[in-house]
Amino acid sequence: MAFNGYGIFDSDPRKNPSSDLRTQFWLAFLLGASACVFFCFFRKRWKVLYAPRTTIEGLNLPTLSSSYYKWLMDLVNIPDDVVQNCAGLDGYVFLLFFKMGIKFLSFASLLGVLIIMPVNKHFRGDAFGNITLSMPAKSEYFFSSPLVKKSIVQSPIIANGSELNVGVLGPSLFNPIGNLSDIPGLPQPGDGFLYLYVLFTYFISIFLLYVLFSSTKSIADIRQSYLARQNRLTDRTVFISGLPNELCSTENLKAYFDKLDVGSIDSLSICRNYSYMDILLSKKSKYVKKLEKYWSIYLSNCKKLGISTLPPSNYLSPNRAELESTPEQLLEVPWQHHQCHPLIKTHFFGIFGQKIDAIDFYSAKLYKISQQIENARSFDYPTTGQAFITFESMATAQIVAQTHIDSKSLMGLHIELAPAANDIQWHNTYIGRWHKFFQGWFITLVTFMIILLWTVPVGAIAVFINLDTIRRLWPELGRMIEDLPFLNSLLRTFLPTLVYSLFISISPFLFRWLSSMQGLSSRAEEEIYAVGKNYAYLFVNFFLVYVIAGSTSIWELAKDTTSFAHFLANRLPHQAQFFIDLIVLQGIGMFPLKLIQLGKLSSYFVRRSFVPYSIASKKFETPDSFSVGIFLPQPMFIMLICLCYSIISPLILVFGLIYFIIGFLVYKYELIYQMEHPQHSTGELWSTIFLRMIFGCVIMQLTMMGLMSLRKAYWLSTVIFPLLCFTVISAYNFSTMIRSSMQFVSLYYIRTHQSNTLSSESESRNSESSGSYVHPGFDLSNEELPLIDLNTA
């Protein structure tokens, strides 16, 4: 059709969202299906890569079928208690978020497909809900009706090819009929669907709050029961900071707590500034890795030449009697092995100097640094005003952590439950509380600046991959893209989502590093802070900025900032296609690729070119670390998108449901069979998830209130306001009443469960045995272990 003055007769198939969606879906499906096929094949070929945790003794992981597809059903049928035992409490909470998302999106998708989409089709002529939020002219109300469109097309004026003349139709045709529409603040003619939008805003919001609070209760009960059965050192230990100088000694601090009569103390560890010890340990670790590398080369050379290797008595350990002899006696080896020993140059990065035996060189270095560490243990290190106190009772630790003990310093004594000993960032215990306070705010400011600065490349990409911009900057390329429907569809769907997927994949590592610089006491805290930073980055750059910058009108917007609200309200529904394409690519295309572990597989072949085969294989067989700071923000952001578009464009709910189903299966397999989660946050991650979901619900409600206001339906906007208040109050209630149960363990559960014998579950490997609260430089428990693994040949 030629007539498009009101945008209602445009039949260009290249501008059909469903056509673009089909292209994106089939591209993502091809990518995901190929990844699934390769995984099913590689899983049988390289079991040590795709299920490395099955080789660890004592885990007792459930066995999956060896067939190509039956393993998927076995994975689905693994019960929650087994998942909790195998993946840990944090892994269980992570998967529960996906289960909650599946439950919510199933309900919302049902509403969207059965009710909202037909409503959009009837009132707007578009089932996908690509509506304009701003208030159109009355003539646009008229022409937006499907019945009026049909009558105009059949009219002789249009049939004869004449231009449409409003005057010919008569001004009376545009007078709205009806009493309610004449009342200021109520929907205008053609906007009756807004009443249903308000109703479904209530339905979706209330159901989201229901699944959030029901999941919170489930997690709280499981967490209380799970932790109450434990009797580990971690569960009986508190971390205290802000100690004055007179309490920075073991005797005085113990006497102080004995005077308070809060409970019997089992052990006490004063934190000191062990910076010098950390330097020595870092050097020792470097020498051990070098020695392991060259020993592997030596074993490989011996195998090639058919020479027997040295006996296991040449393992190096600082406590062995051999170290009492001189380095020359220790490093003496039979002459026939000299030709197998690798040689290195020690001057100027290994470029100049005489070649010497690498094993002898680094063995001497290791011996020397071990002696330095032994001597450094007798040094007197300054205290840092912090300490770990382990009580004999878990209940005592829980009470002390929730009690205001004293105000000995300006900020008072601060007591909290201690992280696991193997999760502590010891170098952050060297700095005082004021230093941590200012350092934390400085990193927060840096994060804020990075998020804002990142809007420049994100906004530029959003503009330059727009067809209007391409036509203006490169007319020939723009015409070529217009003439090729498939290329046009790729530009509108696959290319933008692929580019932004790369941004989404890179940013988590930056924000995890920033969190590590914040001075936090444990890696678990760093993970939680990384989740918040990355989520804020995704919200600002991939929601707000893309909605604004995804139009060539951004330059006009910069000149007239007063039109920001009107422009944002108009742009939001028009970006629904991009977000649907993003969810399709991430869920159907990218999630299956995670199972293949292309990064680990490619790094293995690259490492084999530079390091011995044994070292590459050892890295290849080691389970990767599962980081919630990297994997959690994106699903929370996808849930935010689904919430905001749940009523405007309900089709997004269907693909959001697919995203969460595939993500649940992928992460369930990874947490049980592929990855370790060494952090120990004991399920406190749920508080972060809960508040971000409330934030998404508030954004959705504000969007719907803006829709009503910009359509001049002010009364309907005020109807949504009580729901907004109820949602905010729910978040406040969570923070004041429920959040404590996500941080502490109730005395009732402790008394009930610890009166019985500890179950085997609490003795499992997944209970995250923490060791003792001693700096690694003073921990003698690992001294008898060989420094290098000579069995890797």
Swiss-Prot record:
Residue intervals passing through the bilayer: 22-42, 96-116, 193-213, 445-465, 494-514, 535-555, 578-598, 647-667, 688-708, 714-734
GO cellular component: fungal-type vacuole membrane; plasma membrane
UniProt-annotated location(s): Vacuole membrane
A GO term, aspect molecular function: calcium-activated cation channel activity
Natural source organism: Schizosaccharomyces pombe (strain 972 / ATCC 24843) (Fission yeast)
UniProt keyword terms in alphabetical order: Calcium, Ion channel, Ion transport, Membrane, Transmembrane, Transmembrane helix, Transport, Vacuole
Role summary: Acts as an osmosensitive calcium-permeable cation channel.
Cytoplasmic side: 43-95, 214-444, 515-534, 599-646, 709-713
InterPro entries: Csc1-like (IPR045122), CSC1/OSCA1-like_7TM (IPR003864), CSC1/OSCA1-like_cyt (IPR027815), Csc1/OSCA1-like_N (IPR032880), RBD_domain_sf (IPR035979)
Region annotation Disordered: where it falls in the sequence: 759-778
SUPFAM superfamilies: RNA-binding domain, RBD
Domain of life of the native organism: Eukaryota
Lumenal side: 1-21, 117-192, 466-493, 556-577, 668-687, 735-793
Membrane topology, as annotated: Multi-pass membrane protein
Pfam families, A to Z: PHM7_cyt, RSN1_7TM, RSN1_TM
Similarity comment: Belongs to the CSC1 (TC 1.A.17) family.
Keyword Ion transport: yes
Protein name as annotated: Calcium permeable stress-gated cation channel 1
Main location: membrane
